[in-house]
Design a protein with these regions (language model features):
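Fungal secretory targeting signals
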Residues: 1-17
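Substrate-binding cleft of extracellular glycoside hydrolase catalytic domains
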Residues: 18-148
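Glycine-rich, charge-decorated loop segments at or immediately adjacent to ligand/cofactor-binding or catalytic sites
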Residues: 89-92, 163-171
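Structural recognition of alpha->loop->beta junctions
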Residues: 98-114, 119-121, 167-196
Length: 229
């Protein structure tokens, strides 16, 4: 979640989201190894996404403690996986994510896992894949996750990356909830296929640790999202 283009980061200064009566959230990783979850909850945060895995060789050393801490504080929480389509298949990475904290259960406090797919921080921006191959990779990850859990994963991305690296595919808009990253006062144009975003990452800093997010709905809607109803 730290690899947004510099141009996007430059727009962050003084940017605030549209005023909404909506649940606030955060997302964290090993960059935030120690989080005071009680304070986060008292600050009005309702949900959190926590980095679990990356590729097929990395497990966040902070994930377990962060997940337990968020649970104990009464937050709705879920895990996310940073994709590396250049290293292995989508199915292989979905299985790795599922095996290391990325699962879902209908307990009312677990969000479906999220696939974080964005510009490559260490190589070709589209990981060396054509748009068609990228769409196939994402579908492989998504279908594998859905088969295992009964839920399609949330897709975290930017409109710019999605347009560049998938050819602005509309293939996932009716199945996968969208978590859009745009550091501005409004979400702007969404990737093709999605009529609305489910989550919006609107800043990479704020009162709480990690990135700042909004759920597009009310508290009851967030609970339904966790339940899968």
């Amino acid at each position: 979640m730290k690899y947004l283009p510099l141009l996007a980061l430059a727009t962050l200064a003084s940017a605030l989201p549209e005023k909404r009566a909506t649940p606030y959230g955060i997302d964290v990783s090993s960059y935030q190894p120690t989080v005071d979850w009680t304070t986060v909850k008292n600050n009005g945060v309702s949900f959190v996404y926590i980095k679990a895995t990356e590729g097929t060789t990395y497990i966040s050393p902070s994930f377990s403690n962060q997940y337990i801490g968020a649970t104990d504080a009464g937050l709705i929480r879920g895990g996310y996986h940073f994709a590396h389509p250049d290293l292995s298949t989508g199915a292989t990475q979905a299985d790795y994510f599922l095996a290391h904290g990325g699962g879902w259960s209908a307990d009312g406090i677990t969000l479906p896992g999220a696939l974080d797919i964005e510009y490559n921080p260490s190589g070709s921006e589209c990981y060396g894949l054509t748009a068609a191959s990228m769409v196939s990779w994402i579908k492989s990850f998504s279908d594998t996750y859905e088969t295992a859990t009964g839920r399609y994963p949330v897709i975290y991305t930017t409109t710019d990356w999605w347009t560049t690296c998938t050819g602005n595919s509309a293939a996932f808009g009716t199945t996968n909830p969208l978590w859009i990253a745009i550091y501005s006062s409004a979400v702007g144009t969404l990737p093709a296929g999605w009529q609305y975003e489910t989550f919006w990452q609107y800043a990479d800093s704020g009162t709480n640790p990690g990135d700042a997010d909004l759920f597009n709905g009310d508290a009851a809607g967030l609970s339904r999202m966790a339940l899968g109803s």
